[in-house]
């Protein structure tokens, strides 16, 4: 049975969409998570994305959470699926389950490696990379195949890659292997905006691009992202601007910077991929409201 997907319908109609990431719990309780997802849905999010054990730390499974949210809230979901933790059999089994639950979009990524200190107990799998994973996912659909219609596969795009020419070439290869579009790393510098422009210029309209927007909430947060999180670059003037601010002031500044970055990214993007810092749902409700009133009011 074909699924009526409100997110894809809106995206393919040329309307700007809002996807928002909310990390799954570290324990077995989904109560607060579902409450947060419901608030983000009410605020106007078109899609909820769930990371797959980011920085290789175990959390509740992204695909299971996606199914629960989709089933209980009716909100479109995009579980991330890494190549790090599953072999081909486990990947196929999970994809078939997602399809049966009505979750028809996935984000295929290679995934952060297991920290060296933990590799005696936890093993990397990496049977394939994100391009091969995308190719495999789309190969499951068709006459006589396991899925009657294809899943939609998105990928990641690092606007902050040191060699952006290589990143652009890989993006083209990902499209050739079945991906439909990209969610980018956070736009937190003018160079990231320029690389987003180059991406649109190079890939044209064949790729759907959601520009990553993540509010910085403190100087410590900015420094950590700059130094410790792969693929993120925070401009120096942004880091300096948070010096001496308390929580309320930090959130207010982070909100304004996010809106500025979103405004600059808008001409080159099909929508936004919002990342929730420290599960601060109230902050993201404010960001969505202002995006809708200040940037997307004509939709």
Sequence positions of predicted segments:
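Conserved N-terminal beta1-alpha1 strand-loop-helix module at the mouth
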Residues: 1-50
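Active-site mouth loops of central-metabolism enzymes
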Residues: 17-32, 77-89, 151-166, 242-256
């Amino acid at each position: 049975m074909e699924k009526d997907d409100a997110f894809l319908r809106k995206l393919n109609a040329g309307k700007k969409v809002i996807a928002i990431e909310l990390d799954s719990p570290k324990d077995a309780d989904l109560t607060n998570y579902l409450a947060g997802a419901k608030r983000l849905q009410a605020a106007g999010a078109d899609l909820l994305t769930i990371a797959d054990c980011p920085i290789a730390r175990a959390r509740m499974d992204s695909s299971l959470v996606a199914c629960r949210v989709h089933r209980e809230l009716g909100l479109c979901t995009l579980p991330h699926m890494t190549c790090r933790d599953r072999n081909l059999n486990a990947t196929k089994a999970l994809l078939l389950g997602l399809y049966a639950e009505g979750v028809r979009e996935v984000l295929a990524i290679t995934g952060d490696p297991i920290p060296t200190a933990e590799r005696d107990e936890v093993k990397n799998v990496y049977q394939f990379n994100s391009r091969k994973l995308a190719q495999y996912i789309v190969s499951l659909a068709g006459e006589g195949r396991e899925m009657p219609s294809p899943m939609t596969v998105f990928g990641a795009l690092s606007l902050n890659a040191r060699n952006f020419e290589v990143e652009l070439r890989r993006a083209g290869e990902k499209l050739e292997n079945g991906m439909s579009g990209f969610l980018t790393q956070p736009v937190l510098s003018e160079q990231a905006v320029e690389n987003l422009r180059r991406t649109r210029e190079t890939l044209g309209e064949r790729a759907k691009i959601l520009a990553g927007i993540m509010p910085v909430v403190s100087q410590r947060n900015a420094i950590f992202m700059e130094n410790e999180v792969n693929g993120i670059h925070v401009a120096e003037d942004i880091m300096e601007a948070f010096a001496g601010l308390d929580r309320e002031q930090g959130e207010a500044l982070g909100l304004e910077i996010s809106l500025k970055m979103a405004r600059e990214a808008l001409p080159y993007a099909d929508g936004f991929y919002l990342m929730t810092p420290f599960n601060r749902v109230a902050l993201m409700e404010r960001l969505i409201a202002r995006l809708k009133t200040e940037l997307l009011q004509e939709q």
